[in-house]
Amino acid sequence: MNMQRILVYSDKGVSPYYLRHTVRWLKQAAFPFQMEVCRVNGQFLIHEPLWEETTQLLVIPGGADVPYHHVLHGLGTARIDNYVREGGAYLGICAGAYFGCAHFSFLEPNGSLLVAKRDLGFFPGMANGPAYDSAFSYTSSSGVLAASLRFTDFPGKSFALFNGGCYFENAEDFSEVRVEARYNDLPGSPAAIISRRLDRGLVVLSGPHIEYLPEFCSLQEENVVHAREQIAKNSAGLEEYKQTLIKRLLSNVVEHVLY
C-alpha cells in the first residue's frame, strides 16, 4: 500500500499556535521520508473512505480534549483504534495525550476538577494534569514553563515546553507500556512520555510539547522567554529523542487490513 501521508487533526479545540508548531516540526522531520503532512478535521476521520490505507501516522496535537471527544466519540475513535491496531501509528501531544488515555483528571483554570473516561484507552491507566502547579489558561501563555525531562535512552539534561500537560500515573505498573521520559523535577519523577505497541500499531503519548520549536517562537511573555531560552540551551537529549521517534513512527508496519 502507498502510505505517504501524515494526518494532523485540526478541528474544534485544537490550539492554532501548537498546531503551527506541530505541522512545521513534522514537515521538517518527515522530509527525508517524502511524506505529505495534511491537516484534517473530524468529519474526515469519521467519513472519509479508506484514509487508513494511505496514512502512516495520525497526530492529535495540543489544545483542549473535551471538544476532541465531542467530535470524535463513537465512530471517529473506533476508526482511530482500528487504524492503530492494524498497523498505524498515533502520536498524541498534550491534549492529544489526554485524549488517548482511558481515564484522566484535570484541574481546570477555574478550580474545578474534570475527571473523565475516554474511548481510545491507549494508556490503560490514569493521566493527571496539569503535571506542574502552574497558572494554566486556555486563552493565554500564563502556564508555560520549561519541564526538565530525563529520557530513558538519551542521558543528559534536557528541557521541553510544558503548558497544561499530564503525567501518566504508575505507568511502570503496566507491562505493555514503556516509559520514554520522566519529569525530572517533580516528586517521584512520574512518566512524561510513554509508548505502547498495540497489536501491529504504535502509540506514543507526550505530556510536554515536544513539537515546540523555540526558534519559531516570538511570544514575549516573561515566562515564555525564560522557557524558550532554557529549551534552546538544553535540547540535545530532546532532539536526539525526536529524531529517533519520527523514524519509529514512520517506519512502523505499513500493511493495513480493512474490514
UniProtKB/Swiss-Prot annotation:
Q: Give the matching CDD domains.
A: GATase1_ScBLP_like
Q: Which SUPFAM superfamilies match?
A: Class I glutamine amidotransferase-like
Superkingdom, according to UniProt?
Bacteria
Query: Can you name this protein?
Result: Uncharacterized protein TC_0305
Similarity comment: family membership: Belongs to the chlamydial CPn_0128/CT_035/TC_0305 family.
> Which InterPro entries does the protein's record reference?
Biotin-prot_ligase_N, Class_I_gatase-like, UCP016642
